[in-house]
């Protein structure tokens, strides 16, 4: 059985909704300190604020790039990543160009990821880059290809979902993604992880990071009504 301490260090404590306020971000950071979560995941505009709140802690600031559709230009994604790292982000979760992947334009998808990896790690080589493939929109073949491209581009993690699509992480998808990347990358499960039991299932399937807005409920052994 995985200990609750170990699970806490796998959680990206997440708040990405449009209505999040500075007070909400402050609460998120306080909870992260209380439960010793791995990171807080916030929208880019809140990165400087969260970085300031967490500057004397071990908790990282994670943010999202090209979120949630992945449909901004590569240049914009690269700038967004660079700006976020300059302002204190130590982890960036980027969304792939889903339409390009589905159209078989793999070189485009690869370059998109590469540019973000380069922009982020160019500012700070220790930055962790996670690639959101948005599994709910992909066939198994597309999921495999997306994972392969992420690894080729130098990403550290592949991530299931934004939490804003039609579905979140499933045990089957986490297994498939882990099988595909092997030891070359890690897997982050996100979307719909609302309980301690959900967390354990994802970890057993191969996830080493969990994106959830239900971190506190998970640690308290409750079931949360949160969507992400």
From Swiss-Prot:
Function per UniProt: Catalyzes a reversible aldol reaction between acetaldehyde and D-glyceraldehyde 3-phosphate to generate 2-deoxy-D-ribose 5-phosphate.
Protein name: Deoxyribose-phosphate aldolase
E.C. no: 4.1.2.4
InterPro entries in UniProt: Aldolase_TIM, DeoC, DeoC/FbaB/LacD_aldolase, DeoC_typeI
Subcellular location: Cytoplasm
The keyword Cytoplasm appears for this protein: yes
Pathway the protein contributes to: Carbohydrate degradation; 2-deoxy-D-ribose 1-phosphate degradation; D-glyceraldehyde 3-phosphate and acetaldehyde from 2-deoxy-alpha-D-ribose 1-phosphate: step 2/2
Keywords noted in UniProt: Cytoplasm, Lyase, Schiff base
Family: Belongs to the DeoC/FbaB aldolase family. DeoC type 1 subfamily.
Active-site residue numbers: 93, 159, 188
One Gene Ontology molecular-function label: deoxyribose-phosphate aldolase activity
Gene: deoC
Main location: cytoplasm
Disulfide bond residue pairs: none
GO terms under biological process: 2-deoxyribose 1-phosphate catabolic process; carbohydrate catabolic process; deoxyribonucleotide catabolic process
GO cellular component, one term: cytoplasm
Catalytic activity: 2-deoxy-D-ribose 5-phosphate = D-glyceraldehyde 3-phosphate + acetaldehyde
């Amino acid at each position: 059985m995985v200990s609750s301490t170990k699970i806490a260090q796998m959680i990206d404590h997440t708040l990405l909704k449009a209505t999040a306020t500075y007070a909400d971000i402050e609460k998120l950071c306080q909870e992260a300190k209380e439960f010793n979560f791995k990171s807080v995941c916030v929208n880019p505009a809140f990165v400087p604020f969260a970085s300031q709140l967490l500057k004397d802690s071990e908790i990282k600031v994670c943010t999202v790039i090209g979120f949630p559709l992945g449909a901004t230009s590569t240049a914009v994604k690269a700038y967004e990543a660079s700006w976020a790292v300059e302002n204190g982000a130590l982890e960036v979760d980027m969304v792939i160009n889903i339409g390009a992947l589905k159209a078989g334009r793999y070189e485009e998808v690869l370059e998109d990821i590469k540019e973000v990896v380069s922009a982020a790690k160019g500012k700070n080589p220790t930055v962790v880059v996670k690639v959101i493939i948005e599994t709910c929109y992909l066939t198994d073949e597309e999921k495999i290809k997306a994972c392969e491209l992420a690894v080729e581009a130098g990403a550290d993690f592949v991530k299931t979902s934004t939490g804003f699509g039609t579905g979140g992480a499933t045990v089957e998808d986490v297994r498939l993604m882990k099988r595909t990347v092997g030891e070359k990358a890690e897997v982050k499960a996100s979307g719909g992880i609302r309980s301690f039991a959900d967390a354990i299932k994802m970890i057993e399937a191969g996830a080493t990071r969990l994106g959830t807005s239900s971190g506190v409920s998970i640690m308290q052994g409750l079931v949360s009504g949160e969507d992400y």
